[in-house]
Curated annotation (Swiss-Prot):
Role, per record: Component of the ubiquinol-cytochrome c reductase complex (complex III or cytochrome b-c1 complex) that is part of the mitochondrial respiratory chain. The b-c1 complex mediates electron transfer from ubiquinol to cytochrome c. Contributes to the generation of a proton gradient across the mitochondrial membrane that is then used for ATP synthesis.
Recorded GO MF terms: metal ion binding; ubiquinol-cytochrome-c reductase activity
Record protein name field: Cytochrome b
Keyword Calcium among UniProt keywords: no
Cofactor(s) listed in the protein's UniProt record: heme b
Places the protein is found: Mitochondrion inner membrane
Cofactor binding note: Binds 2 heme b groups non-covalently.
Binding partners and assembly: The cytochrome bc1 complex contains 11 subunits: 3 respiratory subunits (MT-CYB, CYC1 and UQCRFS1), 2 core proteins (UQCRC1 and UQCRC2) and 6 low-molecular weight proteins (UQCRH/QCR6, UQCRB/QCR7, UQCRQ/QCR8, UQCR10/QCR9, UQCR11/QCR10 and a cleavage product of UQCRFS1). This cytochrome bc1 complex then forms a dimer.
Binding residues annotated for heme b b566, in chain numbering: H97, H196
Binding site for heme b b562: H83, H182
One annotated GO biological process: mitochondrial electron transport, ubiquinol to cytochrome c
Amino acid sequence: MTNIRKTHPLTKIINNSFIDLPAPSNISAWWNFGSLLGICLILQILTGLFLAMHYTSDTTTAFSSVTHICRDVNYGWIIRYTHANGASMFFICLFLHVGRGLYYGSYMFPETWNIGIILLFTVMATAFMGYVLPWGQMSFWGATVITNLLSAIPYIGTSLVEWIWGGFSVDKATLTRFFAFHFILPFIILALAAIHLLFLHETGSNNPSGIPSNSDKIPFHPYYTIKDILGALFLIITLMTLVLFSPDLLGDPDNYIPANPLNTPPHIKPEWYFLFAYAILRSIPNKLGGVLALILSILVLAIIPLLHTSKQRSMMFRPLSQCLFWLLVADLLTLTWIGGQPVEYPFIIIGQLASILYFMILLIFMPIISIAENNLLKW
């Protein structure tokens, strides 16, 4: 009898995607983050589902319902903090996954890369709306400030903002619709992730050398399933350590104060994973310019494949490009730090310089250095 795993229409898809999938023999731990992102997504959907059972999306009771989850629901506190810190783990894995793609030239699979950018935008939108739901001070003012940015769009801006708010300010209607969107978007992310995998399996995985590996493939199971389980263990241990020892480490203390439209917090700032984009937004004195820079800080990834001038795909054997890549990482860390600082000297100028450097590395320095490396190798 033929193995049902290989013949049944449903199990055949799973088999060809996760079991008998031919994978390059030399992919490193940097290729673990795809599966870790899958684990994060499932974890967020499950914890979110249980939170939604007890949460109420009404301005008068939202804050109290979150308190009720933490105090009165059995293991409610662990579900709430796993969900909150799970988002941080999600973004750590996302940034490392994108960084891996930039370093090893994975962007040369344009379909996979572009779906990845759409996924990044969708996850960021979901996380932003989730941050509004506890209805603390930072939730309310974060929602007000970020949605208000849309008013910079000429002609339709003001109408668009009021349409999103469902009124003339962030209120009950805004909270209810944000909850609805926050609930539905993870399932859209799930569908997009499936398309992401579909495109990836059309071409096969890239590998650290950037050289086609068709002549040297190994089955995904057991080699990479074991490797992914090890990565998953590290992820879960890190997440649980965070949840059980310092659950509020990455949060904002202001969010333990119920939302008050009459009292503005001294420093309005988003969660840590948005700080780099927030710093770029703040570094431009013009409102519309700031909004465009904010969008372009992520959208710039879409033109990276067009700016690939090197004869080699990966940066593995390109020391000058490696130096630039790590300068970019340092620059992003600087932007993250600046995003959390008040708008005053010297932080303003540091933020502006770091923002300029970010775009210059990606759009100017990378292509030029790649051409220089080609010439050095007489290619």
